[in-house]
């Protein structure tokens, strides 16, 4: 199975070996912005450019997929247009797994209930907590048992076609 990993644009928070491993295992590297409606579009692009420079140095690949920490609704239409105009595809998690606040079992129950209640594409947001590794293993097992197709987010999969169309 492959996944998309949203790396913070603040590259000082990166574990270089982990970033290399993400790319080596065929996963998609993407970026996670920390922006609100007051963040200048040029500043967001500068952050993404710096992160891409570091990602390319470490892995030889650049990323054109981005998400905002607080969701694309926290961005203005103009900000989304700047990002889309620069060639980025915006993604929002459809479900926060809850692994930041809950133990793995509670987060698993919440996430599986969501999977069971929808037939659409589910983008699950996982955090970096003690519960995350166990939750990830349990979810991968569940997805396999249920025959749910899973794949990584790529530049060409359901891209944003306009600033008002974020996924």
Model-derived regions: residue spans:
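A mature extracytoplasmic/lumenal domain signature
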Residues: 7-11, 33-35, 70-72, 94-97, ...
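Alpha-helical scaffold elements lining the catalytic groove of polysaccharide deacetylases
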Residues: 36-57, 72-120, 132-138
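Short aromatic-enriched loop/helix-cap "lid" or pocket-rim segments at secondary-structure transitions
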Residues: 18, 77-79, 164-165
């Amino acid at each position: 199975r492959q996944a998309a990993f949203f790396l913070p644009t603040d590259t000082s928070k990166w574990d270089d070996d982990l970033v290399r491993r993400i790319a080596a295992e065929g996963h998609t590297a993407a970026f996670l912005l920390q922006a609100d409606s007051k963040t200048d579009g040029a500043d967001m692009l500068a952050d993404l450019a710096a992160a891409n420079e570091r990602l390319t140095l470490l892995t030889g690949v650049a990323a054109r997929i981005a998400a905002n920490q607080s969701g694309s609704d926290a961005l203005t239409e103009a900000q989304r247009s700047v990002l889309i105009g620069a060639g980025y595809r915006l993604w929002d998690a459809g479900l926060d797994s809850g692994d930041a606040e809950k133990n793995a079992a509670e987060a698993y129950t919440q996430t599986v209930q969501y999977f069971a209640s929808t037939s659409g594409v589910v983008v699950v947001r996982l955090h970096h907590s003690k519960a995350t590794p166990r939750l990830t293993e349990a979810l991968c097992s569940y997805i396999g048992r249920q025959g749910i197709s899973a794949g990584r987010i790529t530049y060409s999969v359901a891209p944003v076609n306009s600033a008002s169309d974020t996924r």
